[in-house]
Amino acid sequence: MSMGLEIAGTSLAVLGWLSTIVCCALPMWRVTAFIGSSIITAQITWEGLWMNCVVQSTGQMQCKVYDSLLALPQDLQAARALIVVSILLAAFGLLVALVGAQCTNCVQDDTAKAKITIVAGVLFLLAALLTLVPVSWSANTIIRDFYNPLVPDAQKREMGAGLYVGWAAAALQLLGGALLCCSCPPRDKKYAPTKIVYSAPRSAGPGTSTAYDRKDYV
């Protein structure tokens, strides 16, 4: 695997990891839907994983942290846990990628480096899935409630910027992890057998005495 491809994969995965952190902190997973009687509402409600915010028409914003985890919908409760695990898993994957990077000397063997890089890629892929699942689940819940006639218009929400950031983060981590998984261990070098050249013994000259004289055989 070339160093350029490895750097590209690691960079994309790091961007996805940072985007996941932004997605986790952004209080804009759900936004007030302006339909029906809510069109004349002079405030906008944002709902995130950790707090909800109310933005007045004057531009004043007030945010409040959730008092209890049970106050959250089921999809946001699961999203909290999965997104946090995704961030921690991607952070561990980044450390593994640095250990197996070609520009570091933590590991000397090229084959071991390639295997470590593949492990880092798998960790980033798992982190991407842990981000993609809660984001898609929350988006599905929002769309389902939006078109449900039994849900009052005041309780209907639209998809916020946090969901789009989450999808972008998952895509970056998937692409970066896939590039890191392309790191193949180097093949064993095959050496050609050494040819041994035998030289013929020199024949003794006519006047040269040999180790054994002919008279010894008589």
Swiss-Prot record:
<dbReference type="GO" id="GO:0001666">
    <property type="term" value="P:response to hypoxia"/>
</dbReference>
<feature type="topological domain" description="Cytoplasmic">
    <location>
        <begin position="102"/>
        <end position="115"/>
    </location>
</feature>
<feature type="transmembrane region" description="Helical">
    <location>
        <begin position="9"/>
        <end position="29"/>
    </location>
</feature>
<dbReference type="GO" id="GO:0005923">
    <property type="term" value="C:bicellular tight junction"/>
</dbReference>
<dbReference type="GO" id="GO:0022604">
    <property type="term" value="P:regulation of cell morphogenesis"/>
</dbReference>
<dbReference type="GO" id="GO:0010629">
    <property type="term" value="P:negative regulation of gene expression"/>
</dbReference>
<feature type="topological domain" description="Extracellular">
    <location>
        <begin position="137"/>
        <end position="159"/>
    </location>
</feature>
<dbReference type="InterPro" id="IPR006187">
    <property type="entry name" value="Claudin"/>
</dbReference>
<dbReference type="GO" id="GO:0098632">
    <property type="term" value="F:cell-cell adhesion mediator activity"/>
</dbReference>
<feature type="region of interest" description="Interactions with TJP1, TJP2 and TJP3">
    <location>
        <begin position="217"/>
        <end position="218"/>
    </location>
</feature>
<keyword id="KW-0965">Cell junction</keyword>
<comment type="similarity">
    <text>Belongs to the claudin family.</text>
</comment>
<dbReference type="GO" id="GO:0070830">
    <property type="term" value="P:bicellular tight junction assembly"/>
</dbReference>
<dbReference type="GO" id="GO:0014045">
    <property type="term" value="P:establishment of endothelial blood-brain barrier"/>
</dbReference>
<dbReference type="GO" id="GO:0016338">
    <property type="term" value="P:calcium-independent cell-cell adhesion via plasma membrane cell-adhesion molecules"/>
</dbReference>
<comment type="subunit">
    <text>Can form homo- and heteropolymers with other CLDN. Homopolymers interact with CLDN1 and CLDN2 homopolymers. Interacts in cis (within the same plasma membrane) with CLDN19. Directly interacts with TJP1/ZO-1, TJP2/ZO-2 and TJP3/ZO-3.</text>
</comment>
<feature type="topological domain" description="Cytoplasmic">
    <location>
        <begin position="181"/>
        <end position="218"/>
    </location>
</feature>
<dbReference type="GO" id="GO:0003382">
    <property type="term" value="P:epithelial cell morphogenesis"/>
</dbReference>
<comment type="function">
    <text>Plays a major role in tight junction-specific obliteration of the intercellular space, through calcium-independent cell-adhesion activity.</text>
</comment>
<keyword id="KW-1133">Transmembrane helix</keyword>
<feature type="modified residue" description="Phosphoserine">
    <location>
        <position position="209"/>
    </location>
</feature>
<feature type="modified residue" description="Phosphotyrosine">
    <location>
        <position position="198"/>
    </location>
</feature>
<keyword id="KW-1003">Cell membrane</keyword>
<dbReference type="Pfam" id="PF00822">
    <property type="entry name" value="PMP22_Claudin"/>
</dbReference>
<keyword id="KW-0597">Phosphoprotein</keyword>
<feature type="modified residue" description="Phosphoserine">
    <location>
        <position position="199"/>
    </location>
</feature>
<dbReference type="GO" id="GO:0007155">
    <property type="term" value="P:cell adhesion"/>
</dbReference>
<dbReference type="GO" id="GO:0030036">
    <property type="term" value="P:actin cytoskeleton organization"/>
</dbReference>
<feature type="transmembrane region" description="Helical">
    <location>
        <begin position="116"/>
        <end position="136"/>
    </location>
</feature>
<dbReference type="GO" id="GO:0016328">
    <property type="term" value="C:lateral plasma membrane"/>
</dbReference>
<dbReference type="GO" id="GO:0042802">
    <property type="term" value="F:identical protein binding"/>
</dbReference>
<dbReference type="GO" id="GO:0010628">
    <property type="term" value="P:positive regulation of gene expression"/>
</dbReference>
<dbReference type="GO" id="GO:0005886">
    <property type="term" value="C:plasma membrane"/>
</dbReference>
<dbReference type="GO" id="GO:0003406">
    <property type="term" value="P:retinal pigment epithelium development"/>
</dbReference>
<dbReference type="InterPro" id="IPR017974">
    <property type="entry name" value="Claudin_CS"/>
</dbReference>
<dbReference type="GO" id="GO:0150111">
    <property type="term" value="P:regulation of transepithelial transport"/>
</dbReference>
<keyword id="KW-0812">Transmembrane</keyword>
<dbReference type="GO" id="GO:0030336">
    <property type="term" value="P:negative regulation of cell migration"/>
</dbReference>
<keyword id="KW-0472">Membrane</keyword>
<dbReference type="GO" id="GO:0030335">
    <property type="term" value="P:positive regulation of cell migration"/>
</dbReference>
<dbReference type="GO" id="GO:0008285">
    <property type="term" value="P:negative regulation of cell population proliferation"/>
</dbReference>
<protein>
    <recommendedName>
        <fullName>Claudin-3</fullName>
    </recommendedName>
</protein>
